[in-house]
Amino acid sequence: DLKWEGRDFMYNPEQPVFEEQPESNIEIAYGIEDVPKPWWKAVLFALQITLVDFTPFMWAAGFASLAGIDQPDFVPTLLCACFFCMGICTFLQTTVGNRLPIVQGSSSALMSSMGNIAAVYGLPAVWGASLIGGLIQTILGITKTVSKVRVFLPPVVVGSVVTAIGFVAARIAVQWTFSRQEPLYLVLALISFLLALILKFKTKGMVSQGFILITVVIVGVVVSSFLGIFDWNAVYAAPWIKIPRLFPFTGLSGQPNAVITFTAAAIIGGFSGYMGAIFESVGDYAATCAACDEIYRVKHIDKGIMASGLGCMITALFGGLPCTSYTQNIGIVAATGVASRRVTQYAGVLFLLYGFCPKMAYILAGIPKPVIGAVFLISAASIMFSGIDS
């Protein structure tokens, strides 16, 4: 049996990962198993999640650039596939995975590795590398391999992990806030930040918990439309319905005719991205538990990695980019106190619907990033302070 500082490391799914659990200073309005009532309140909280966790728009364009693909229909089709798979993966994680309020979506690390594979070996090799990488990740979760790293994690690590993830979230927020440096966008960002602060700390109940949604709708949609910077043309041009299908890019001009190929170099290169995503997920699970005031248990690692792997295998079949846990959603939980996994399941359903309705997806894309970034700064700060206190 493995022993470390007097602890027994025989496998026990209910065993806490850390001997000393952090005390969260976050006021939880809805716990993991709570269901906000009435139903429309849960739907609004879910919509709030989708307003922040919509980065497939960035990763799809980045992937196309790395892959050297410039066909006009490629990015819109990839966007729909990513949202569709994002919904499946999120619902899978919150239902049969670790059952934490975690959103699964495309990540920069996996996007970069898969984009490089596409540039050298073509899209069929990307789906092959994604499928094998997801299979290996699933096996790692089923065999409980990843959870064994807990023997190297002393209790003091939990606060450091949560704080580090808070800094990552803050970096994302700052990048979004200053993604457009024209004076008008910076003023919108400042207005968004101040309005979000007022709603969060000077109001109570539904308004305080929904400060992200309210701020983004008022400033990001209404005010931006009035100022003429919300891109409604892309929304009007997008179709209402687009049905996802298996291997949607087969026969794409300039790409190999094969549906899927398995190339050793592509698989190895792709799995390097998967390994980074796996260890990032382990940290995200710790931060999520800290934000939810939930004990971080061994089962959260194993079931989470297994569900993430299964989700990546599904994305390979539908032509989406591999999915991993999203740091942004931890910030939403920490800032709003809404830790209900039912809300996150509803968000998964909304992402699924975005995959069927490109017009709705483009409405999200039209919201100026500085508005989203300014609001998300508050969420990132909540994560950092939670980690420092623990």
PLM features per residue range, with description:
Residues W4-P101, A109-A119:
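N-terminal signal-anchor module of multipass membrane proteins
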Residues D8, P13-E14, A67, Q71-F74, ...:
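Flexible hinge motifs at transmembrane-helix junctions and intramembrane kinks/re-entrant loops
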Residues A42-G62, A258-G283:
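Core transmembrane alpha-helical segments of multi-pass membrane transporters/permeases
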Residues L47-L51, L153, V157, E182, ...:
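Hydrophobic alpha-helical transmembrane segments of multi-pass membrane proteins
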Residues A64-L92, V96, I268-R341:
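Membrane-embedded helical hairpins/re-entrant loop segments and their flanking transmembrane helices
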Residues N98-L110, V151-V158, S208-F211, G320-N329, ...:
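Short, non-helical or kinked segments that cap or interrupt transmembrane helices
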Residues M114-A119, N329-T344, V349-G355:
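Interfacial segments of multi-pass membrane proteins
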Residues A119-D231, G348-S390:
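Membrane-embedded alpha-helical modules
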